[in-house]
Amino acid sequence: MALPFADDSVDICLSSNVAEHVPRPWQLGGEMLRVTKPGGLAVLSYTVWLGPFGGHEMGLTHYLGGARAAARYARKHGHPAKNNYGSSLFAVSAADGLSWAASTGAAVAAFPRYHPRWAWWLTSVPVLREFLVSNLVLVLRPR
């Protein structure tokens, strides 16, 4: 999952709605930090698994479990979902993203994408954030 860029080579690195589609999202985040110049910005935004859109086209059935939701989708529609749980869609939590960002020492901000600013406090409440933050934005500034 190495990005094809040299270390410290870009001013801004953005990943929007990709992390939930790779098996190792924090490796992706690490690569983003590697290629971002010190003082630059890395922005990683992803759909939170337990949020209302975590199952993507499977809708809220992902609350039944990823494999079960995928099987139900295939039965109902006669073909597998485009985002196949376990191979092209993975359960990524808000807690894991916040923990990873904090561990880098580069975290600047974390907030829920698509929410008004007054609702940004939701990211600070464990459990609640997993269900009410549909998409988490992590902003990092490498040193």
Language model features by range: what are they?
Residues 14:
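A conserved beta-strand element that flanks and buttresses the S-adenosyl-L-methionine
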